[in-house]
Amino acid sequence: MKKDLFLISLVSFVFFIFGNWILSLTSLDEGRNFYATLHMLRTGDFIVPYYNCNYRFEKPPMLYWLGSLSFLIFGISEFSARLISGLSAFGTTLLIYFITLKHVSREKALLSALTFPLFIHTWIESRAYVPEFTLVFFSTLGVYLFSIDRFTLGWTALALAFLTKGPVGVILPIGIYLLWRRDLKFLNFKGVLLFILIGFSWYFLMIYKFGFNFFFKFFIFENIYRFTGTYQIHNMPIYFYPLVILVSSILFLPVFLKILKDFDKRLLPFAGWFLLVLVFYSLSKNKLHHYILFSYPALSVIIGFYLTKRYIKYAYIVGSFLLLILMFGVYIYEQKRFTPKAVDFLKNSEPQKLYFYKHENSAIVAYLYRCITKENKFKKGDYVITKKKYLRDFKNYKLLIEGLEFEGKEVLIKVE
């Protein structure tokens, strides 16, 4: 087992953590999360999240708390922020090993655990300062603990998942357990009580401080409205997630034929896990690619069951080559990015009047740790960050910085 765990640790470092510092912060989520974490550290207020001098009610605080701890240990940097996701991915890989070890076999446990880091999607999300992988870790931990009848600890894990992303961190793991075991033994009084005390602690404080405004914004708007489509910003077709999964698991496509041809009944609980997550998020009117991450642990077990040591060896050779190409591409892209160039310029010039126009770059807000408002009217001498396509709205200006970002070219101008 020691050799297995060493191999898993080594692979996880390479595929989840190494090189996470190459790319500077991205907008929108990373910048907002980084700012909120930095604000907590500088103000000592670890209850109320802020971004750009406004309350940030959209996300619970677990990522910010873990990020603050990482900042204190390793310093404030992209590496220490993204390390949270990398370690969460590593922890999830270990859980896949122990789940498979308990319910299948040791040989399949190693193959299943080694499958997970070869999902291309995980290479990206484990290097992003977002809460998704932390949610996957705590949710998977809850499922594992429930499956071995450690219900009190399982509820504690779900409380942490609830503090990471909200209701989804509880609903899906419980749904998976019910599909798996079809009993109510998990309704342990001590465990449920701990869940309420831990999981609801922050929510109670926020509701006490902000009342219905917070309750509506987080529970109604950010969860119910997004799921039902009352508020739509990421409207994708029903086949969106199957497509994401196929691309992510491209190294294992030949194995899918074996799975369909000779499915083993021992994998039914994992098939239920995978399908529940897939169907749940496919029914949501708002779809983002990282929502589907929680299906990957189950898919890893299913795929790993049919792998041979020879197959996984060659898969890692190809996967390592693909990762190297991806990281090299990211390095080249970083040299052309707008954000690092703009941040260097703005830190040196320190303009008093800096605004956004029809656009927002949260990474710049985070790096400068200053409030930048959106405006529509400007005066001579104002500095403005916007997309290049909006330059047509300005008559007289001086172009200071231009560069690439994921949403298109961005510019920094000075109004003349």
From Swiss-Prot:
<feature type="transmembrane region" description="Helical">
    <location>
        <begin position="237"/>
        <end position="257"/>
    </location>
</feature>
<protein>
    <recommendedName>
        <fullName>Uncharacterized protein aq_1704</fullName>
        <ecNumber>2.-.-.-</ecNumber>
    </recommendedName>
</protein>
<keyword id="KW-1003">Cell membrane</keyword>
<feature type="transmembrane region" description="Helical">
    <location>
        <begin position="312"/>
        <end position="332"/>
    </location>
</feature>
<dbReference type="GO" id="GO:0005886">
    <property type="term" value="C:plasma membrane"/>
</dbReference>
<feature type="transmembrane region" description="Helical">
    <location>
        <begin position="263"/>
        <end position="283"/>
    </location>
</feature>
<feature type="transmembrane region" description="Helical">
    <location>
        <begin position="84"/>
        <end position="104"/>
    </location>
</feature>
<feature type="transmembrane region" description="Helical">
    <location>
        <begin position="192"/>
        <end position="212"/>
    </location>
</feature>
<comment type="similarity">
    <text>Belongs to the glycosyltransferase 83 family.</text>
</comment>
<keyword id="KW-0812">Transmembrane</keyword>
<dbReference type="GO" id="GO:0009103">
    <property type="term" value="P:lipopolysaccharide biosynthetic process"/>
</dbReference>
<feature type="transmembrane region" description="Helical">
    <location>
        <begin position="128"/>
        <end position="148"/>
    </location>
</feature>
<keyword id="KW-0472">Membrane</keyword>
<dbReference type="GO" id="GO:0016763">
    <property type="term" value="F:pentosyltransferase activity"/>
</dbReference>
<dbReference type="GO" id="GO:0010041">
    <property type="term" value="P:response to iron(III) ion"/>
</dbReference>
<dbReference type="InterPro" id="IPR050297">
    <property type="entry name" value="LipidA_mod_glycosyltrf_83"/>
</dbReference>
<dbReference type="InterPro" id="IPR038731">
    <property type="entry name" value="RgtA/B/C-like"/>
</dbReference>
<dbReference type="Pfam" id="PF13231">
    <property type="entry name" value="PMT_2"/>
</dbReference>
<keyword id="KW-1133">Transmembrane helix</keyword>
<feature type="transmembrane region" description="Helical">
    <location>
        <begin position="160"/>
        <end position="180"/>
    </location>
</feature>
<feature type="transmembrane region" description="Helical">
    <location>
        <begin position="288"/>
        <end position="308"/>
    </location>
</feature>
<feature type="transmembrane region" description="Helical">
    <location>
        <begin position="5"/>
        <end position="25"/>
    </location>
</feature>
<keyword id="KW-0328">Glycosyltransferase</keyword>
<keyword id="KW-0808">Transferase</keyword>
